[in-house]
Regions:
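Register position in tetratricopeptide repeats
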Residues: 48-49, 82, 116-117, 150-151, ...
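Helix-start (N-cap) detector for alpha-helical repeat units in TPR-like alpha-solenoids
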Residues: 35-37, 70-71, 104-105, 138-139, ...
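Canonical tetratricopeptide repeat
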Residues: 41, 75, 109, 143, ...
Length: 679
């Protein structure tokens, strides 16, 4: 059994309880400023409505108004927690207890966050501090019980759940968690009693039936187990975990059709669920359908290239299909991943003999015998015992909680609902109206040169990296743009902006060229060329991206020598694109004016596209030094750091980005920054 279920209980419980508790907590002190009251109310209201990013925005403002208000950091920590930003939440909860060392709720929530990182000793210390401050707050015992469970101190977990249940005897979650703890203490009788009690308290919650059904299955009471899964599914027809478990139960009853139907149902909702694909592959092979078995196992390997069982079993499919060379490659990979895999050596020996590689076959056979003998000497078991241990390599797998989700996310490199890309380049664009610079507490970037440049335009122009800037059409601007007044460089620049808005990219580049080549009539005209180079660089990069998008839509299929399409990394064709002209333009912009953060941000982005990641990090850092509230720069630098395997720093940057209003950051944090502990 995995610890994931009880943790998922906690997370689900927290989703509902975190906000309720937070909003019921007393808020002391009277704010001196009306604005502070307004932002505080808006932040708490957003929390109650589940609008966590909006809540963070309001608490950000409060944190700048008053850096000593521990409630502000506490509430912001709750919002970050619910967005998956555990590091950011941990930092805010730590700040809340630093500002108020007797803040019970701060220690409580800090402990919960620590436990998600697997820092159970620290979590238990924080919970003990909270209990010392408020021994009568019963919810602390529930949280500490969960933490003890995760720390594998099951007897202490039972003790804390006992205390909680004495005060809250009608909370089914407590019985479910105590039952799970008792299972690990091998007390199946009391565990079953707890599951029965949880079901009696809430017969409309499928989790109780799933837990009890799995317990019945472990006792080989499959009829009772399937009955409980049927009940769970009737309560929640979208509960894929119930279908998954029922499939294994049907399989144990040799009802392969029913098992396959349930696995198909899981994959309908979660088409990339690696564990379900793996199990379906094994059943397909067992009934002789090797084509479907291969399709599923290929996907498992694509999702998780380090899965030794997938290579081992796919090799056996190839053996049954007499595809000896393919089988040999997979046994090679399985042994590479698991050098002590005696059964793989034995099977590879057989494949090598079929390929006429007699010397290699004899060598592998001897290695296999030696490993079996070593195993027997260490365990005191005979070959029959060894044979039994190998059964697990070709039997269905079962896993608790979010079964295999972390693995199958890797296949797509992004969540289905989260677009993990660099934040785009900044540029000047036409707009229906000019920027409103009267942003109170919005940390707007102010640069006198940019402001003068924009104010001198004949038409509304803004600088942005968003595609949501409204422009109802360029016709209304044409007279002002082509009136012939003003400095030539600015006039050509405005014409280029109009062409870009109308998607006349070649014409736009000509106008940018003219703006850059124009004579500088005064010092400002010379400095304005930083913006001309910047926008031309962006245009050049966009044109390259457009070409690459067309070429990448043409897919290449590679066939092996037996006519079977194989999806392997080595078969994929990639092409790099030359951004050197765009990079050169951006570097010239830096040479003209060296304190515009947007230019350094754009240069860093282009360096990423050119695979110059270390240089890119330096320029993102420069952009941040010039504009510390540039969330986009934190976001992109975080992605690059994660790509370069500096995950800790990358996740800190993403947390800053989310705090600064980049909502995409929280989707990336959930994908890359949540640790294995607590998942």
């Amino acid at each position: 059994m995995n610890f994931g279920n009880i943790d998922s209980d906690l997370r689900r419980k927290l989703k509902h309880i975190f906000i309720v508790i937070a909003l019921l907590l007393p808020c002391t002190g009277v704010f001196a400023q009306y604005d502070k009251d307004v932002f505080f109310f808006r932040g708490r209201r957003a929390l109650a409505d589940g609008k966590y990013s909006q809540a963070i925005e309001n608490f950000n403002v409060l944190s700048r108004i008053d850096t000593t208000d521990y409630w502000t950091f506490f509430y912001r920590g709750i919002a970050k927690y619910n967005l998956g930003d555990l590091r950011g939440a941990q930092k805010d909860f730590s700040t809340s207890v630093r500002l108020n060392p007797v803040f019970t709720s701060g220690y409580h929530y800090k402990a919960i966050t620590e436990s998600r990182f697997g820092n159970y000793d620290k979590a238990l210390e924080d919970l003990q501090r909270a209990i010392d401050l408020r021994p009568g707050y019963i919810g602390l015992y529930f949280s500490r019980g969960v933490t003890y469970f995760l720390a594998q101190q099951f007897d202490k977990a039972v003790s804390d759940f006992d205390k909680y249940i004495r005060k809250e005897p009608k909370d089914p979650s407590a019985y479910l968690n105590r039952g799970a703890s008792r299972l690990f203490l091998q007390d199946t009788t009391k565990a079953l009693a707890d599951y029965n009690k949880a079901i009696a308290l809430d017969r409309f919650e499928p989790e109780g039936f799933i837990r009890r059904g799995r317990l019945y299955a472990s006792q080989h009471k499959y009829a009772d187990a399937i009955s409980d899964m049927n009940m769970a599914i009737s309560l929640d027809t979208t509960n894929t975990f119930a279908y998954f478990n029922r499939a294994i139960m049907y399989y144990e009853q040799s009802d392969y059709n029913a098992a396959m139907a349930d696995l198909d149902r899981v994959l309908k909702d979660e088409p990339g669920n690696a564990l379900t694909l793996y199990n379906r592959s094994l059943i397909s092979a067992q009934v002789g359908n090797y084509a479907d078995a291969l399709d599923d196992m290929d996907r498992v390997i694509n999702i998780n290239p380090g899965n030794v069982l997938a290579y081992y079993n796919r090799a056996s499919f190839f053996v049954n299909m007499e595809r000896w060379q393919d089988a040999l490659e997979d046994y090679d990979k399985a042994i590479e991943l698991y050098p002590d895999f005696a059964k793989a050596y034995m099977n590879r020996s057989y494949v090598e003999s079929r390929l006429g590689l007699n010397k290699e076959s004899k060598r592998d056979y001897d290695i296999a015998r030696r490993k079996i003998d070593d195993y027997r000497d260490k365990t005191g078991s005979g070959e029959a015992s060894f044979a039994d241990t190998t059964k697990k390599y070709s039997s269905l797998l079962s896993l608790d909680a979010d079964f295999a989700k972390k693995d199958f996310d890797d296949e797509m490199l992004q969540h289905r609902d989260v677009d993990i890309k660099l934040r785009p380049l900044f540029r000047f664009v036409l707009s229906d109206k000019r920027d409103n610079v009267q942003y109170a507490l919005k940390n707007r970037y102010e640069n006198p040169l940019i402001d003068k440049f924009l104010n001198g335009m004949a038409v509304p122009v803004v600088i942005t990296n968003s595609d949501t800037v409204r422009i109802s059409g360029t016709d209304k601007f044409m007279q002002a743009i082509y009136s012939g007044g003003g400095e030539k460089g600015v006039a050509e620049f405005q014409k280029a902006l109009a062409d870009v808005a109308d998607k006349q990219f070649n014409s736009a580049q000509v106008h940018y060229d003219n703006a850059i080549d124009s004579d500088a009539s005064d010092k400002y005209a010379k400095l304005y060329k930083v913006f001309y180079y910047m926008n031309r660089a962006v245009l050049r990069a966009d044109m390259i991206d457009f070409i690459s998008s067309i070429e990448n839509n043409v897919q290449t299929l590679t066939m092996d020598d037996q006519g079977t399409t194989r999806a392997r990394v080595k078969d994929q064709v990639s092409r790099s694109y030359d951004y050197s002209d765009a990079v050169e333009d951006m570097q010239k912009a830096v040479e003209i004016v060296g304190d515009v953060p947007y230019v350094y941000f754009n240069l860093a982005n282009l360096q990423c596209l050119s695979s110059s990641y270390v240089d890119a990090i330096g320029n993102f850092t420069k952009a941040i030094s010039l504009y510390p509230y540039m969330g986009d720069a934190y976001f992109n630098r975080g992605l690059v750091l994660i790509y370069l395997k500096d995950k800790e720093k990358g996740c800190i940057d993403l947390s800053h980005a989310g705090e600064l209003g980049i909502e995409d950051a929280y989707g990336v944090i959930k994908k890359y920054c949540e640790t294995n502990n607590g998942e």
